[in-house]
Amino acid sequence: TLPPGFYRSLHPLGDASACNLSERNFLAALDDYRKLCALVEQHGGCIEQSLAGDTLTLAPGLTAEVLAPSGTRAAALTASMQELYRTPQGVPEFREKLDALDASMNNFSLILRLTFGKTRILLPGDTNRAGYGGIPPEKLAADLFKVGHHGQLDGADAALVNAVRPRFSVCCASSDRRYNSAHPDTMRLLKDSGAELYFSDCPPVDGQSIPPHRALEFTICADGASSARYLP
């Protein structure tokens, strides 16, 4: 989402200014982003920015269409990051800007729709239901949907599910439900739409017994046939 080389304008933040666990984690994530980008380039990797409208060829017959963020949204994130890093950590304004950025960051996620033959896969990152604005509903239609924001209550709504109409939905939810992932209302919404529900972990889900597993495997065929299984 951010421009290539943007990380070079960032400096270490540390967590001395954090007043709670959420702020401490977000500060650590910002520092990790800077370190990761530097490490990628040190090892000869190339950092590229993808924006809505781009199409990437991942393998023969497999493409990824970038649905979000738009150039305008990416520029807004860049400006917010620059403003945060220009503000001294010791002043109240820093925490205000930090918390505002933390609250909005998920909805700058890269949203991809993969196409392989007749099969489409929607990967919205950590986006919640408010992060799909500006994407034409027909672009969201998919056979396999990785539910955004870990399936929390704001991960999807009826309008989004009606646009996607997935045959399969995957929820990356922690078993301890610490952040209310795999929220019952969100899971019910998807199930009532006719989607088969699958999980990366084993959260308690009403009416469904999820076997202990170490992985979830999908087999996607170009003719539209798909299947899923838990690997014990």
Language-model-derived ranges and their functions:
Residues P137, D185-T186, G194:
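Short alpha-helical interface elements
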Residues R73-A182:
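Active-site-proximal loop/helix segments of hydrolase catalytic cores
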Residues T1-L122, A195-E196, S200-P232:
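Flexible, acidic/histidine-containing loops and adjacent segments that form or flank the divalent-metal
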Residues D157-V161, S181-L189, I210-A215:
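Histidine/acidic-residue-rich catalytic or RNA/ligand-binding cores of hydrolases
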Residues S169, L190, F218-I220:
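Residue-level detector of buried hydrophobic side-chain packing
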Residues A29-L36, G131, D157, T186:
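Stable alpha-helical elements in mature extracytoplasmic
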